[in-house]
A protein has these predicted regions:
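Dinucleotide-binding Rossmann-like beta1-alpha1 core, especially the glycine-rich loop
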Residues: 90-172
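N-terminal Rossmann-like FAD-binding beta1-loop-alpha1 element of flavoenzymes
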Residues: 47-74
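Active-site lid/adjacent beta-loop-alpha segment flanking the redox-cofactor pocket in flavoenzymes
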Residues: 97, 274-385, 389-391
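Central helical "cap/lid" subdomain
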Residues: 82, 230-283, 309-316, 331-334
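Glycine-rich FAD pyrophosphate-binding loop
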Residues: 67-87
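C-terminal catalytic lobe of FAD-dependent flavoproteins
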Residues: 9, 336-448
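A conserved short coil-to-beta-strand element within the FAD-binding core of flavoproteins
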Residues: 208-224
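Helix-loop-beta segment of a Rossmann-like dinucleotide-binding subdomain
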Residues: 99-100, 125-135, 159-202, 206-209, ...
């Protein structure tokens, strides 16, 4: 500050004034891009908002907006929530932590903690069980990382703890050979369909039974018409949030989003005397839930280039194989299983190139590509140019197999942006899950 003494105000003889000296930072030492910034529009809480997709992403987003005073409706072709990849009735909140520093590790930790608090209400209403999740290492490298994680997250000692063989057997209730693991006492499993039904009923969110196959911008008021397969307008949305997983690519404004349709099969099998002793979820190469009404669930497969909706016997074997590769003692839990006691279900995840979700405003691909074309020549060039985005259009998708972990976090991000609230996360995390991130990256690498 530049401080000076001048004539005082009123009866005061003198007073001190100060003027802030803004030091301009050289753009060559601190490159800056504002591609993530969009022009803000005035939002009235009473406006009707519509969400495409009634899975965990769409339902949590609807609730986050309803809590902020918006009128929200969900459009889903099934006419009910908790379908498609969100039809998993024994879904695990899978912990994913890293010994590395940076925004990715921070994002996973923040999202996981937010999810833990978010789902307490559902566990209290018997929509799952907060039985704890035991994470077992699948390699010597992971075993070493577990010790490093314990050191790195000492301030999070109540969130998880490093446990030895004796503790593992006590916590899990079964005999295992593995020497160490990480135990997350506040995590567990949930029935995603029941969670979706519970929150949409509690917050009185209407479900419109229509198959939305197209959207179009109404330029006179920047609203969006939503069409069915007959090109009939279903609704006119003042604001529209697309939350239909990999199917975002079927809509023209979001067709550029790089989302892969990835098949996953879950195996369900009848419990036996030994497996009934399992008290918590165990995660390693795959996962295994405790007996729920005499049924265990384990999984899940990651089938690339396989779009079959039929249950595959080979995938059941693969899921059992994942358990045994984690610890040979799992053989005691799955031996002598009759094929008639095995069932399962198939779902299709929507995954991104970097395995992080898309959450935020939908960029105008052509305008962004033109506006930031200079990045092809100089990837480090700084600019004050803000991004080009479609008005009143948002996307929440690409959570892969971590829908339960990421959904509450992404829902809050989108609801905050629509409400013109300040984001509650570090800037770099916001950029890492921003829908425009691949446009900027691909321009810098001359891919587009």
């Amino acid at each position: 500050f530049d401080i000076s003494l001048c004539d005082g105000f009123g009866a005061k003889r003198e007073m001190i004034t100060a003027k802030f000296k803004a030091y301009a930072t050289s753009s060559s030492t601190l490159p800056s891009l504002n591609w993530y910034i969009q022009k803000k529009s005035k939002t009235k809480p009473a406006e009707n908002l519509f969400i495409l997709g009634g899975g965990i992403a769409g339902c949590t987003t609807a609730v986050a907006l309803k809590k902020r005073g918006f009128n929200v409706s969900i459009i889903d072709r099934h006419g009910e929530v908790g379908k498609e990849a969100s039809a998993n009735s024994r879904a695990v909140i899978y912990p994913k932590l890293s010994t590395e520093s940076g925004s990715l590790a921070e994002f996973n930790l923040i999202a996981l903690k937010l999810a833990t608090n978010y789902y307490r209400e559902f566990w209290a209403n018997d929509l799952g069980e907060q039985c704890g999740v035991l994470l077992l290492p699948t390699s010597d490298k992971e075993n070493e990382e577990f010790s490093k994680l314990q050191t790195k997250h000492q301030c999070n000692d109540k969130f998880f703890e490093l446990v030895n063989l004796k503790q593992i057997q006590k916590l899990s209730g079964i005999k295992l050979d593995i020497a160490h693991g990480l135990f997350f006492p506040t995590l567990g499993w949930l029935s995603i369909p029941e969670v979706c039904k519970f929150i949409t009923k509690k917050y009185d969110i209407p479900i419109i039974s229509k198959d939305a196959t197209g959207i179009s911008l109404v330029k006179r008021d920047n609203s969006w018409d939503v069409f069915d397969e007959n090109d009939t307008v279903i609704v006119n949305a003042k604001k529209l949030i697309i939350a239909n997983s990999y199917e975002v690519q079927n809509l023209k404004p979001t067709s550029y989003l790089s989302l892969k349709k990835l098949r996953g099969q879950v195996t369900e099998f009848c419990s036996n005397q030994e497996s009934e002793k399992l008290k918590c979820v165990i995660c390693g190469d795959g996962y295994l839930t405790p007996s729920i009404n005499g049924i265990h669930a384990c999984g899940a497969t990651y089938n690339h280039n396989d779009l079959s909706e039929s249950i595959n016997e080979l995938d059941h074997r693969a899921n059992f194989g994942k358990l045994i590769s984690t610890d040979l003692k799992f053989k005691n839990l799955i031996h002598n299983i009759d094929s008639t006691d095995i069932s399962g279900w198939v779902g299709f995840r929507g995954t991104t190139r970097d395995y992080l979700p898309f959450a935020g405003p939908v960029p105008n691909f052509d305008e962004m590509k033109e506006k930031f074309s200079y990045l092809r020549l100089d990837a480090k060039k700084a600019s004050d140019d803000i991004g080009s985005y479609f008005p009143n259009l948002y996307v929440n998708s690409g959570m892969g197999s971590r829908g339960l972990s990421y959904a509450p976090f992404c829902a809050e991000i989108i609801a905050a942006e629509i409400s013109n609230q300040i984001p509650f996360i570090p800037k770099q995390i916001r950029l890492d899950i921003h829908p425009a991130r691949f446009i900027i990256r691909d321009l810098k690498k001359k891919r587009i």
